[in-house]
Amino acid sequence: NTVWPGTLTGDQKPQLSLTAFELASKASQSVDAPSPWSGRFWGRTRCSTDAAGKFSCETADCGSGQVACNGAGAVPPATLVEITIAANGGQDYYDVSLVDGFNLPMSVAPQGGTGECKPSSCPANVNMACPAQLQVKAADGSVISCKSACLAFGDSKYCCTPPNDTPETCPPTEYSEIFEKQCPQAYSYAYDDKNSTFTCSGGPDYVITFCP
């Protein structure tokens, strides 16, 4: 299936020259990022253009009305790959995050570099295990994405917002455990960094795969 990847640069920095594009099955696309750089990548699915020429997607839409996202982020639920590229070949950080929910499997793997440089992947279709309260369904009744408990319920115990804004006051919940069980390498909620953050040094390239 075709996906429409999007990119978002963080920290109020200029966007990449490519903020989104169409990606056919088995195809690849190179995206240049400067160093240092920090941002995220995601994949939109079930996209179409209406009679008026407005482009939109049923999952992870960026609301721009066109294929390019132009500095707009994904509307959750959306699986995210987050990458922080260090200056001068220093230590990069990267992860797959389900903190904003899940819409499709993703992985990120460094090519080259030094240090750990292990791939991080969420290969499971979490939609198949998504509890009813978190499901987002298409018109035909199929589950097309899975909300985070924070998005579904807005409660600070799920969102890790004050007063529950420390690892001690925001432990895993039954909902984040579902994500954790499906994709143990991914961030399942805000304070899940024990086994979810990956590092690599020496200026590697990164290969991001949708539906690995």
From Swiss-Prot:
Record has Cell membrane as a keyword: no
Pfam families linked: Thaumatin
UniProt similarity note: Belongs to the thaumatin family.
Keywords annotated in UniProt: Disulfide bond, Secreted
InterPro entries hit by this protein: Osmotin/thaumatin-like_sf, Thaumatin, Thaumatin_CS
Disulfide bridge partners, by residue number: 47-57, 62-69, 117-200, 122-183, 130-146, 150-159, 160-170
Protein name: Thaumatin-like protein 1b
Taxon lineage: Eukaryota, Viridiplantae, Streptophyta, Embryophyta, Tracheophyta
GO cellular component assignments: extracellular region
Location within or outside the cell: Secreted
